[in-house]
Amino acid sequence: MSKIIGIDLGTTNSCVAVLEGGEPKVIPNPEGNRTTPSVVAFKNGERLVGEVAKRQAITNPNTVISIKRHMGTDYKVEIEGKKYTPQEISAIILQYLKSYAEDYLGEPVTRAVITVPAYFNDAQRQATKDAGRIAGLEVERIINEPTAAALAYGLDKEEDQTILVYDLGGGTFDVSILELGDGVFEVKATAGDNHLGGDDFDQVIIDYLVDQFKQEHGIDLSKDKMALQRLKDAAEKAKKELSGVTQTQISLPFISANENGPLHLETTLTRAKFEELFAHLVERTMGPVRQALQDAGLTPEDIDKIILVGGSTRIPAVQEAIKRELGKEPHKGVNPDEVVAIGAAIQGGVIAGEVKDVVLLDVTPLSLGIETMGGVFTKLIERNTTIPTSKSQIFTTAADNQTTVDIHVLQGERPMAADNKTLGRFQLTGYPPAPRGVPQIEVTFDIDANGIVHVRAKDLGTNKEQSITIKSSSGLSEEEIQRMIKEAEENAEADRKRKEAAELRNEADQLIFTTEKTLKEVEGKVDEAEVKKAREAKDALKAALEKNDLDEIRKKKEALQEAVQQLSIKLYEQAAKQAQNQQAGADGATKKDDNIVDAEFEEVKDDK
């Protein structure tokens, strides 16, 4: 059974963790970083993911960022004449995380727990699950990000406590209130905003810089795609720097040009100015905080700990606003970038049976119901109901002799159906005509542990039943998913071949370099015919490299290795021969010395 990895699939960055020996561990990417940018780029038929994709975003218009904002919608991104759904782009990121997790673990990975914002609706959750399937992962559980963070924080805590998780991600904002005690993590309430995050903080800086430049030079940089990408990078960098310093320099030379020549953007942004620009965004996060407290029936005094999640919670003004609202300092003991993936890995351990005595009770973030007469939204399951759950209600017909009932399933909080999110529609047909108000139709909603909705309608008179697993208008059919899985596998195979080809070329280059070095060293020491053979093999490999024919490179590389090996053998033989000759010479000298006889002499005295 393969290990279950925990994945935080973020708007800006993603992170993957695994449970090893009962301890959660974040898996670093090939560049050695613990988080990976959620960026995908397409270049000359090749797919780039993560750091490499982000680095070339300025010059490559075929770069996709923040795709998570479009999950669960019918948005498509067109690249090189092909349209990609958010699920496919997300699957490319997941595939990359999966591949380096496999390299780290040394075994195939097929199972995962993937996190989503608590406020994600059914369509967004389903899209995330589909992305996992396309990437070749069996998604064991979809878990809410704040809940995962609470799991990571509270696993080793003994005392009972009420915690508030404030999760300000790259593109989404969530707040969840949980009660922790005896290994039970119970979500009491959740609230949020799916269109508020760190990207919006970057955007206020971009808008400010565009406005400044327009006033100074009369040029609108927002119309220039490449300039805009440079502004995005500068804004993100400035935002991060202003969490640690009170002012930062933004310098973008040659950002544009006019008839007088190139134009540069040079400005200083202070923390005070930045705080003024994003004040309305921080205030927007306070609405869901108050809502969650109200739904949980709690006051700020009832909160024991505040856990911060997401890179944007490092902004001092954000921390200050939370402290003002809740009257206490946020807890700084968790890494806001990694805590969600760690929680997902722990949940994976719970599913696999590696983590004992942990029970997770999550809630549905939005109310669920159906449209009834007059376009009214009738709720069957209220928001913040613990999941998994099931709820039934009996409805009847609105007209005489009605033989078909349309069931319009919705999610939201507004009183009128038209103002809420449609999850799907289906029909109950084939029951006998009867006066209005007579038929009894039981509608049952089931929400599973992933927060995914299943609905069935049953005519109690005939016991006829119709059921549906909600597929939103933006959802993918099974055929589409299978096609995308096949494409993803083919692309993974193509990526593997590309990597192998690059490695082969590197090995060939290295061999040519070492051969040239060896040829210089053996000059005059071995037979010239052997040297010539190696030189010809080296030139043949060079020619194959220029042609870029991989089979040819492989053959010529083997031929050169053989020639160099022969050269080494000859060199060794030559050296051995020389050593032998020297030894023989030394032995001969010793034999000559053997004829020397020691003589004794006696001194003769003349006066004898």
From Swiss-Prot:
One of its GO terms (molecular function) is unfolded protein binding. The modification Phosphothreonine is found at T172. The keyword Aminoacyl-tRNA synthetase does not apply. Coiled coil: none annotated. CDD domains: ASKHA_NBD_HSP70_DnaK-like. Keywords: ATP-binding, Chaperone, Nucleotide-binding, Phosphoprotein, Stress response. The keyword Membrane does not apply. InterPro entries: ATPase_NBD, Chaperone_DnaK, Heat_shock_70_CS, HSP70_C_sf, HSP70_peptide-bd_sf, Hsp_70_fam. Induction: By stress conditions e.g. heat shock. Belongs to the heat shock protein 70 family. NCBIfam families: PRK00290.1 (NF001413), prok_dnaK (TIGR02350). Acts as a chaperone. This is Chaperone protein DnaK.
